[in-house]
Amino acid sequence: MPGRGRCPDCGSTELVEDSHYSQSQLVCSDCGCVVTEGVLTTTFSDEGNLREVTYSRSTGENEQISRSQQRGLRRVRDLCRVLQLPPTFEDTAVAYYQQAYRHSGIRAARLQKKEVLVGCCVLITCRQHNWPLTMGAICTLLYADLDVFSSIYMQIVKLLGLDMPSLCLAELVKTYCSSFKLFQASPSVPAKYVEDKEKMLSRTLQLVELANETWLVTGRHPLPVITAATFLAWQSLQPADRLSCSLARFCKLANVDLPYPASSRLQELLAVLLRMAEQLAWLRVLRLDKRSVVKHIGDLLQHRHSLVRLAFRDGTAEVETRGKEPPPVSTVTGDENISDSEIEQYLRTPQEVRDFQRAQAARQAATSVPNPP
């Protein structure tokens, strides 16, 4: 307040009290000089006027992280480090986990669901950054059931309102094929089964693109299709030594799991290749089957676009044409009965009507006269 002495700097008597947080100060209103500062401690009489604030109404409860959430955040970071993801991926996955954990349905969920939530947040982050990681790979690391994981994954995506991009098949093929143990000789892999990585990867990509163009990938898990395409690519590079090797043995040599639908995808790919081979005259005379067509995969892929167009567009139209029998052609002799209503459609003038009536009457009279004996 004014009247409490003078400012030592400017000599003004306009001194006012100003509370800086909990510390009172005497400040000159003219120059802003702090004349005196109060102490931070309070007297016993001041403390008697204070009120107790319950913990539930303070900010400390909202800032505290439960043990379950702390454990989940550690699991997210550990999983990102095991997968060797960039640091930005780890931060994004942690943020998604914290957002999901704010929902009461997630906080009250069972421990199994919270464990799966860790993998879902990491998978969402990888999908958004186009990082080639499959749901099956995370399920293997977490020992989680694939059906349970997929249902919780869709629930989290919907809960957080995320827009997930489609998985890039090319990047997934590169990552998945790199894990095959077929690129260097070992006691478990004979020399005739060892293949160059770049050649095998290039042909596998072409076969996967062929499967995508012929609707073998849409709505299906990608790994069985990639496994079948990798097997065919590996066989076609050295068919003389590898045609006798089965898909199950191939997966065992490559040290990868055999997906259950991979055998069905293999048969579908072979059926597509056979239809393409029928469009080449020099292959049509060889009467290829699903075993021998593997030898000519390189030639078929070289002309893939034109052969697919011929096999699945013109071929479909031809099948539809064969299925429909042409209507029988009736021979017109001129003796067919023509109804009166049809004849009247062709009469235009009154003279034509009169001529038609006279001709009709003469015909009736001729038919009513009996024939002479």
Curated annotation (Swiss-Prot):
Classification of source organism: Eukaryota, Metazoa, Chordata, Craniata, Vertebrata
Region ranges (Interaction with target DNA): 108-114
Residues at which Zn(2+) binds: 7, 10, 28, 31
This protein's name: Transcription factor IIIB 50 kDa subunit
Zinc fingers classed as TFIIB-type: ranges: 2-36
One Pfam family matching this protein: BRF2-like_C_cyclin_rpt
Summary of subunit composition and partner proteins: Component of TFIIIB complexes. The TFIIIB complex has two activities, alpha and beta. The TFIIIB-alpha activity complex is composed of TBP, BDP1, and a complex containing both BRF2 and at least four stably associated proteins; this complex inhibits the transcription by pol III via its phosphorylation by CK2; YY1 facilitates the TFIIIB-alpha complex formation. Interacts with TBP; this interaction promotes recruitment of BRF2 to TATA box-containing promoters.
Origin: domain of life: Eukaryota
Sequence repeat feature ranges: 72-157, 173-249
Gene Ontology terms describing biological process: cellular response to oxidative stress; regulation of transcription by RNA polymerase III; transcription preinitiation complex assembly
InterPro entries per UniProt: BRF2-like_C, Cyclin-like_sf, TFIIB, Znf_TFIIB
